[in-house]
Amino acid sequence: MAKATFAAGCFWGVEDAFRQIKGVTSTMVGYIGGHTQNPTYKEVCTDRTGHAEAVEVEFDPSQVSYKELLAVFFQSHDPTQLNRQGPDYGTQYRTAIFFHDPTQEAEAREAIAALDKSGIFKRPIVTQVVGAPEFYRAEEYHQKYFEKQGIRACHLP
C-alpha cells in the first residue's frame, strides 16, 4: 500500500471523490500543514492554526497510480483559487499536494507544469507542493461525511 495526501477545499467532497476510485483502499479526512498539534475543527476554522482540510488516501499502486490520483485531485476542485473553493474561504481551504516521497513530488510538479502549459485553466495553478508533515485525523463526524448524510456532492466543479 502507498499513501497520498491532498488538500482541495472542503474535505467532505474531496474524500468522497477519492473513495470512488478503484484501488483506493481507505480514506481519512483531517488537518495538515499547520503549526499546532492535534487541532480541532473549531480551531482550524479560526484560520489561526495554519492547517488545511485534507484527505489522506491509502491506495494499491498495482490498481491505481499516483498520477491517476493526481488527475482526480485536479478534477475535484479549482486549483487556481488561492485559499478558497466555492463559497468556502480561508487558508484551511487551500489547494495543496503533500508528497510522501521524491517520486510523488516530481509527479506532482510535472502534473502542474503540464496543466499550466495546456491552457485548460485560464489562471495559473496555485497548488502548493510540500513535504507531508504530521496529519491529524479530523473528528469522527467528518469521516465519510457524505455517506453518513446520504448526499453526493457539495460544490465540487
Q: Which residues fall in each region the model found?
A:
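Flexible coil/turn and secondary-structure edge motifs
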Residues: 1-157
